[in-house]
Amino acid sequence: MVDHARAARMAKRIQTIVASAIERQIKDRRLELVTITDARVTGDLHDATVFYTVRGTDIGTEPDYDQAAEALTRAKGQLRKIVGDELSVRFTPTLSFELDTVPEASAHMEELLARARARDAELAKLKEGAQPAGDANPYKTSDEEED
């Protein structure tokens, strides 16, 4: 029987443990710009997926995703040992790391929304001085035409 609440608690705990281990215990310069964003554990509590993002060294520089992935792969065993020591469970889940694409997707959505707002403002500006193509009241009645 799957206990989703227990899996969620364990995932949150794994996220915290891995993030602090990368910050304090793992000595790899390639992991300095890695941020752990989320963790998910399967229902049987045997596999954990840890999601991460990578920042660039400067605002304008592109992050090195390949180096971060390689560093996480190399530190996977050490991180699993640390997670096993911190968790009080019979079986330590295996760790797999995935690049979190949510920040890039949300930035893209923000860009699309900003473009839509700019187009709406442009259309509103054009609409202010617009006149109807025909008469102002195209639905005249016959009584009005005789006057």
UniProtKB/Swiss-Prot annotation:
Q: Which GO terms describe its cellular component?
A: cytosol
Which compartments is it annotated to reside in? Cytoplasm
Please provide an example of a Pfam family that matches this protein in its UniProt record: RBFA
> Which InterPro entries does the UniProt entry name for this protein?
KH_dom-like_a/b (IPR015946), RbfA (IPR000238), RbfA_dom_sf (IPR023799), Ribosome-bd_factorA_CS (IPR020053)
Q: Which residues form a coiled coil?
A: none
Q: Name one GO biological process term.
A: maturation of SSU-rRNA
Cystine pairs annotated here are none
Q: Which domain of life is it from?
A: Bacteria
Keyword terms of this UniProt record: Cytoplasm, Ribosome biogenesis
Region Disordered: list its residue ranges.
123-147
Instruction: Kindly list the GO molecular function terms attached to this UniProt entry.
Output: ribosomal small subunit binding
HAMAP family noted in UniProt: RbfA (MF_00003)
Family under the similarity heading: Belongs to the RbfA family.
According to its UniProt entry, what is the function of this protein? One of several proteins that assist in the late maturation steps of the functional core of the 30S ribosomal subunit. Associates with free 30S ribosomal subunits (but not with 30S subunits that are part of 70S ribosomes or polysomes). Required for efficient processing of 16S rRNA. May interact with the 5'-terminal helix region of 16S rRNA.
This protein's assembly is summarised as: Monomer. Binds 30S ribosomal subunits, but not 50S ribosomal subunits or 70S ribosomes.
Q: What is this protein called?
A: Ribosome-binding factor A
Which organism's genome codes for this protein? Corynebacterium aurimucosum (strain ATCC 700975 / DSM 44827 / CIP 107346 / CN-1)
| Classification lineage | Bacteria, Bacillati, Actinomycetota, Actinomycetes, Mycobacteriales
Could you tell me the gene encoding this protein?
Answer: rbfA
